[in-house]
Structures are given as structure tokens and as C-alpha cells.
Regions:
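Class I S-adenosyl-L-methionine-dependent methyltransferase catalytic core
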Residues: 1-138
Length: 138
């Protein structure tokens, strides 16, 4: 796709967010909506996070933490990371772990937005959080 209208360079990478190592302080924004461990299985390929990290603990430390860490390294000071991730009936602590990891790495939580998901006929709307974190100045 042609992104010249943005008048900025756009780089697109095809690899997992836990593998992408951005240049230090090169990003203005980091937005991610990672799969919720083994709840969203797109394929059984070895590139999938739930295949690479088969237990919840391995996934949190090997995938989620590394993804957040890469955002922190890449973000410029006072820039934002937004992460859409939610607890599931099977995994009830993903949200708390996300917040804990982000704060441990040095992010400040500034807000939590609500993402409105498609409604199911007669069931009303479902919401998921989008956590907003800022990388503080040193």
C-alpha cells in the first residue's frame, strides 16, 4: 500500500511483537491487541504465541512482557502505549498482569478506554479495556 500521503516513512514488519526490537526511542505510538494466550488460536503454526509459549506463565513472561518491553524501549519519552487485552473466563488475571508488567517496566497508567465490541442480537454490547500507558521523561 502507498503511504506517501502521510508524508512519513512507514515500515511494516512480519514477525511477532515479542521478536520485534525497535530502535531506541524511535516510536511515537505503540498500539497492540495481542491474542489472549490460548483463547484466540489463528493457526497451529510455530509462530503463534500460544504455541511458542504453551503455559499461561510462559506466555505472560515470554510473549506479553517482551512485547511491552519492546514498546517501552522503542517509545520516545512522553509517548503512549495502548494495549487492548482482556481477562477471559479461563484466564482471569491477564489485565492485572498487563498493568503490573507495564508499571514495573516504567510506564505510567493514564487511562482505561472502553472498546465496544460487536453486539450479539439481543445480548447488548460487550466491552474490552484499552489500557493507556505513558513513558515518562527521565
Amino acid at each position: 500500500k502507498d503511504f506517501l500521503y502521510l508524508e512519513k516513512q512507514v515500515d511494516i514488519y512480519k514477525l511477532g511483537s515479542e521478536e520485534y526490537e525497535p530502535k531506541k526511542e524511535s516510536l511515537d505510538l505503540c498500539f497492540t491487541s495481542p491474542p489472549y494466550f490460548d483463547t484466540e488460536k489463528y493457526s497451529l503454526e510455530s509462530t503463534q504465541s500460544f504455541v511458542k509459549f504453551p503455559t499461561e506463565n510462559e506466555w505472560i513472561n515470554g510473549f506479553l512482557k517482551k512485547t511491552i518491553e519492546n514498546c517501552y524501549i522503542g517509545l520516545k519519552e512522553n509517548r503512549y502505549m495502548l494495549i487492548n487485552i482482556a481477562d477471559t473466563p479461563k484466564h482471569k488475571f491477564i489485565e492485572k498482569e498487563t498493568i503490573r508488567i507495564a508499571k514495573e517496566l516504567g510506564f505510567v497508567q493514564e487511562d482505561t478506554l472502553q472498546l465496544t465490541l460487536s453486539s450479539v442480537m439481543g445480548a447488548g454490547y460487550k466491552y474490552e479495556p484499552i489500557f493507556v500507558f505513558r513513558k515518562e521523561s527521565k
